[in-house]
Amino acid sequence: MTDVEKQTEIREKKGRNVMRELKIQKLCLNICVGESGDRLTRAAKVLEQLTGQTPVFSKARYTVRTFGIRRNEKIAVHCTVRGPKAEEILEKGLKVKEYELFKENFSDTGNFGFGVQEHIDLGIKYDPGIGIYGMDFYVVLNRNGVRVSKRRRAPGRIGPSHRVDKEETIKWFQQKYDGIILPPKPKVKKNFFRRR
């Protein structure tokens, strides 16, 4: 047996280990309206209909006069979902995207996110009093044993081999949801120095 064959065999054994299985820690849903008032409260109703939980309002960190945003003004609403409900909502969101994501959607720490243009695609009935809102989905993945680094008493560190990385997340997405990874978007070159 060569070294390469031994390493592949070890990887296969590691893959079958229950402690190495990836799971959804949480799903964060975010709707950024960019202003406080009636539109924001309607966005909160949309999230409440979708999750069955009370959403939380996010405040602006600093004043941006061009956008008409003041510091500490409520401009967005978000909600964190865990457990089977998170998997159910994620399934709806991925169905809207047709299980297709770009490689850029995945972070180096093993999380991924995407956006949905219209919330009515998720199965919520259209209400003319609320309107149509888009939202962001952020999925945080981890393995069993992460609590070691989070606990209050005697916290430890997670070794590099147990951390979740980009490639593992992409593989998990392809296996669990039969997902498709699209080729990267073409980069548009802007010509700043035009000749007249």
Curated annotation (Swiss-Prot):
Gene3D superfamilies per UniProt: 3.30.1440.10
MF annotations from Gene Ontology: RNA binding; rRNA binding; structural constituent of ribosome
One of the record's GO cellular component terms: nucleus
Keyword terms: Cytoplasm, Nucleus, Ribonucleoprotein, Ribosomal protein, RNA-binding, rRNA-binding
Subcellular localization, as worded in the UniProt entry: Nucleus; Cytoplasm
KW Ribosomal protein (keyword) present: yes
Deletion consequences: Mutants have an extended lifespan, increased volume and are sterile with a germ cell proliferation defect.
Swiss-Prot/TrEMBL GO biological process terms: translation
Family the UniProt entry places it in: Belongs to the universal ribosomal protein uL5 family.
Function field: Component of the ribosome, a large ribonucleoprotein complex responsible for the synthesis of proteins in the cell. The small ribosomal subunit (SSU) binds messenger RNAs (mRNAs) and translates the encoded message by selecting cognate aminoacyl-transfer RNA (tRNA) molecules. The large subunit (LSU) contains the ribosomal catalytic site termed the peptidyl transferase center (PTC), which catalyzes the formation of peptide bonds, thereby polymerizing the amino acids delivered by tRNAs into a polypeptide chain.
Subunit structure: Component of the large ribosomal subunit.
Note, other: There's a functional difference between the two L11-encoding proteins in C.elegans. rpl-11.1 plays a role in the germline whereas rpl-11.2 has a somatic function.
Protein name as annotated: Large ribosomal subunit protein uL5A
Taxonomic source organism: Caenorhabditis elegans
Lineage of origin: Eukaryota, Metazoa, Ecdysozoa, Nematoda, Chromadorea
Gene name per UniProt: rpl-11.1
